[in-house]
């Protein structure tokens, strides 16, 4: 195309050309007519959307390396687009039809400073990645920020103020600011959905294509608030993980005791813990006395105690564990009986024998854990 442009037009059509690796099929094979593994982009667009196709081709794209295309990647990109769309719908629902963006207020909460600092850093890093043609790295950062940081954390935390009304105007302004920056940074990869959302939220240019590219702003760098939010988020993650391990449903709330040297930080985050860590109440102190039978969770910045009685019906849980233990012991005895039989070990395929050995090892570990849980329950 370059030679043709020079020959017929007398000028170079492109000054910068990025040469990428081959797009291979899901098995890593080169696409060819003989293999019949070619992909019709128009069919992919019909199925997942043009934005999802563009995003998929950029994801994991490293200079000099080939990439594999699969339906799973297309579905993941479509799901990502849906996640962004639903986040935008949520923001618009609270903005209403007559909302006018007032700019960022001066009185910002810790979570506002945290997300603004995060998106500020994101703008700098994505810009640097694009200038170095590191498209795959830029896309990965955008994906992680939008899905995890913005949707799963900030929006969930912002709901507290939006639903209570107190501080709602500040939350709305920050949501618009961050969403706008996200759309601009994502636009090179997903131009259609970003333009559609941009037109729906307060905007200052006719099209997102001619809007100002986000730039790093030193006044929006809040390192202290970022560190404080990480302490709170680490605690919330730890509580959620422990509850998941114990199969505690979100509907079952519990009091949380936080023993920490950072009382001021966790006092600010107590409402976040109530919403995201399913706490009925949060008590914070430098140290606690005997709290009785509790689940203990340790993070880098706090020791967290949850009364076991708030989480578990001891009698019902004991019956459940005993039933599960009996079933596991019965299954292990059956497998061990097969493995003790020379006829089975010598005649069965090695793969089948190994599967039984692996299953026996897993059951042995499970039985030990169940017995330990029963012992702890009785303490």
Predicted segments, located by residue:
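Feature 926 captures the class I aminoacyl-tRNA synthetase adenylation module centered on the KMSKS loop
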Residues: 7-46, 50, 72-379
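Gly/Pro-rich active-site capping loops and adjacent beta-alpha segments
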Residues: 46, 61, 65
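Conserved pre-motif C helix in the palm subdomain of viral-like polymerases
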Residues: 1-5
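Short, solvent-exposed helix-loop connector elements
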Residues: 65-73
């Amino acid at each position: 195309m370059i030679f043709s442009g020079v020959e017929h037009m007398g000028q170079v059509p492109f000054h910068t050309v990025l040469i990428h690796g081959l797009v291979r099929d899901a098995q890593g094979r080169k696409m060819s007519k003989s293999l019949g593994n070619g992909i019709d982009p128009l069919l992919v667009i019909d199925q997942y959307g043009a934005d999802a196709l563009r995003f998929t081709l950029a994801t994991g794209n490293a200079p000099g390396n080939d990439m594999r295309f699969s339906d799973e990647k297309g579905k993941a990109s479509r799901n990502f687009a849906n996640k962004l769309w639903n986040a935008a719908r949520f923001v618009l629902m609270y903005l209403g039809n007559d909302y006018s963006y007032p700019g960022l207020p001066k009185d910002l909460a810790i979570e506002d400073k945290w997300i603004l600092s995060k998106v500020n850093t994101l703008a700098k890093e994505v810009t640097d990645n694009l200038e170095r043609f590191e498209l795959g790295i830029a896309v990965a950062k955008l994906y992680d920020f939008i899905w995890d940081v913005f949707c799963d954390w900030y929006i969930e935390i912002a709901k507290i103020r939006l639903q209570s009304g107190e501080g709602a105007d500040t939350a709305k302004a920050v949501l618009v600011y961050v969403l706008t920056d996200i759309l601009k940074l994502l636009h090179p990869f997903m131009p259609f959905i970003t333009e559609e959302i941009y037109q729906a939220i307060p905007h200052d240019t006719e099209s997102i294509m001619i809007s100002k590219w986000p730039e790093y702003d030193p006044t929006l760098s809040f390192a202290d608030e970022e560190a404080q939010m990480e302490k709170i988020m680490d605690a919330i993650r730890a509580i959620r993980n422990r509850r998941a391990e114990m199969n505690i449903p979100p509907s079952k709330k519990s009091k949380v005791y936080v023993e920490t040297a950072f009382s001021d930080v966790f006092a600010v985050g107590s409402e976040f813990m109530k919403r995201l860590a399913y706490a009925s109440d949060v008590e914070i102190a430098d140290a606690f006395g005997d709290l009785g039978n509790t689940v203990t969770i340790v993070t880098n910045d706090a020791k967290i105690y949850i009364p076991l009685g708030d989480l578990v019906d001891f009698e019902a849980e004991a019956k459940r564990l005993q039933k599960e233990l009996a079933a596991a012991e019965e299954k292990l005895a059956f497998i061990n009986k097969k493995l003790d039989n020379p006829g089975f070990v010598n005649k069965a395929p090695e793969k089948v024998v190994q599967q039984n050995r692996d299953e026996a090892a897993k059951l042995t570990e499970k039985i030990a854990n169940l017995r330990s849980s029963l012992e702890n329950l009785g303490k």
